[in-house]
Amino acid sequence: MAGASELGTGPGAAGGDGDDSLYPIAVLIDELRNEDVQLRLNSIKKLSTIALALGVERTRSELLPFLTDTIYDEDEVLLALAEQLGNFTGLVGGPDFAHCLLPPLENLATVEETVVRDKAVESLRQISQEHTPVALEAYFVPLVKRLASGDWFTSRTSACGLFSVCYPRASNAVKAEIRQQFRSLCSDDTPMVRRAAASKLGEFAKVLELDSVKSEIVPLFTSLASDEQDSVRLLAVEACVSIAQLLSQDDLETLVMPTLRQAAEDKSWRVRYMVADRFSELQKAMGPKITLNDLIPAFQNLLKDCEAEVRAAAAHKVKELGENLPIEDRETIIMNQILPYIKELVSDTNQHVKSALASVIMGLSTILGKENTIEHLLPLFLAQLKDECPDVRLNIISNLDCVNEVIGIRQLSQSLLPAIVELAEDAKWRVRLAIIEYMPLLAGQLGVEFFDEKLNSLCMAWLVDHVYAIREAATNNLMKLVQKFGTEWAQNTIVPKVLVMANDPNYLHRMTTLFCINALSEACGQEITTKQMLPIVLKMAGDQVANVRFNVAKSLQKIGPILDTNALQGEVKPVLQKLGQDEDMDVKYFAQEAISVLALA
């Protein structure tokens, strides 16, 4: 092949004419061989530009062989190359020549770095669709066979991801060979290969004929689900969902359920975790009869598993389990078969388990209805609101809207208050931040009187929190509250308290007044802004701290559009002009920007 630098200098390189566009192509081609990895990477990312300039023939005859040999490069470069080649069919002459892209991608599918291999497989899957059935058997299937029988496990793992894309369009004889190769990879000596095969088992099952699913895929599933490596067994659980969707109820009971039962009681917690994590999908795939007879007992065991991770994963699925049950049986099954286990989990020793349950338990209220919620769930909610773990309390509060729809929030309000206050004052600022974000929702559900009496002071306290993110969130919170409760409420309750902070000795608190005014002005409208807020902002223009003064300029720019012309010309303009002459550069800059934006020059 021509040297990389020679590639760019022929007349075909940039479409002839020897114009300026030829130069960058020559540079890009040179960079493909540069010692600097960043330059090689840059060139690979522009590979389509090079190919376009070279034309389809030179791309096929020169560029692709060159790229096939660059296999010993940095992983980052190889990753970019694997990605580029997936979209290269048009640049080599269209689908008739798609097979030309296979050699470099085959090489990339065998490298050591997993990310590169995965990207090469992704591109090969893409290109397989562009092969005609004849080309698929002539070029693509042999590639899959070579990878599947490669000496290195890396090539065999890559092959696993390619069976499902070439199987549907292959002839019957070739299909039999493909199935045979997949079977052998499922019993490969190397666990990594069996893992790759297990991860693609469900996907492969979907493209097989039903008879082959029963006669070949199910035995493979059974074998992988009892593999000596738990990392293989847990992937077989994932495949179970896809396989179950393809079989009849009778077949499921005889062919799949014994293996799934075994997985739900596996000695490795990671396999049991996978059953819990995929429970909703398994439930849908298996259908109501098997769910009732087999899956519910398995779920009960997962809820009382000795491993906290498993209990947490199962707890997460409680609400979905209920929603997926037949409507006529939901209430009875949850009340009799699931609720006793939930009651135990409320006082679990592990906070992740309690937190997982708290994030979904409120959703059961819509399934169980008003009476059951008040009698059975309410005591659990109240216990969780008093839990020592902030995440548990937070998860209950953040899902209050579910309960509000069923029983109304008043039932909870007395227990809710201490929990909210504690979270609002929690030492961790992220916990405080989370509760602020739920405040507008809570306010809407609790009503204005309850809010003013119990929660208003908290909202004001957040405005002077020592963490900026909290002060900022508290400001946005006020705006949302005004949108919920109206301008009259703002005028009487919020605005006076905000304006008092303008005289606070701490300049950060004085600045918070300005941030609040920025947020509230739009929600409060012209009259309140002009009469109550503007005078305070103008007065603060004389503040001793430059940070406050330039924030005055920014505030005037923000509230300017809400004010009428008289206020702008008579009050705002003189103050901005004065700030525009300030000794501080930032104050001067923001004042002049405000004058310009408000067209007051």
From Swiss-Prot:
Impact after mutating L499I: In a colorectal cancer patient
Outcome (variant: V500G): In a colorectal cancer patient
One GO CC annotation: protein phosphatase type 2A complex
HEAT repeat windows: 20-58, 59-96, 97-135, 136-173, 174-212, 213-251, 252-290, 291-333, 334-372, 373-411, 412-450, 451-489, 490-528, 529-567, 568-601
Modified residues (N-acetylalanine): A2
One BP term from GO: meiotic sister chromatid cohesion, centromeric
Matching Pfam families: HEAT (PF02985), HEAT_2 (PF13646), PPP2R1A-like_HEAT (PF22646)
Keywords annotated in UniProt: Acetylation, Repeat
Effect of G15A: In a colorectal cancer patient
Effect of G8R: In a lung cancer patient
SUPFAM superfamilies noted in UniProt: ARM repeat
PROSITE patterns reported for this sequence: HEAT_REPEAT
Annotated transmembrane regions: none
InterPro entries membership: ARM-like, ARM-type_fold, HEAT, HEAT_type_2, PP2A/SF3B1-like_HEAT, PP2A_Regulatory_Subunit_A
Any one GO molecular function term: protein phosphatase regulator activity
Cystines in this chain: none
Outcome (variant: V498E): In a colorectal cancer patient
Subunit structure, interactors included: PP2A consists of a common heterodimeric core enzyme, composed of a 36 kDa catalytic subunit (subunit C) and a 65 kDa constant regulatory subunit (PR65 or subunit A), that associates with a variety of regulatory subunits. Proteins that associate with the core dimer include three families of regulatory subunits B (the R2/B/PR55/B55, R3/B''/PR72/PR130/PR59 and R5/B'/B56 families), the 48 kDa variable regulatory subunit, viral proteins, and cell signaling molecules. Interacts with IPO9. Interacts with SGO1. Interacts with RAF1.
Described purpose of this protein according to its UniProt entry: The PR65 subunit of protein phosphatase 2A serves as a scaffolding molecule to coordinate the assembly of the catalytic subunit and a variable regulatory B subunit.
Domain comment, as recorded: Each HEAT repeat appears to consist of two alpha helices joined by a hydrophilic region, the intrarepeat loop. The repeat units may be arranged laterally to form a rod-like structure.
Family statement: Belongs to the phosphatase 2A regulatory subunit A family.
Protein name as it appears in the record: Serine/threonine-protein phosphatase 2A 65 kDa regulatory subunit A beta isoform
Organism: Homo sapiens (Human)
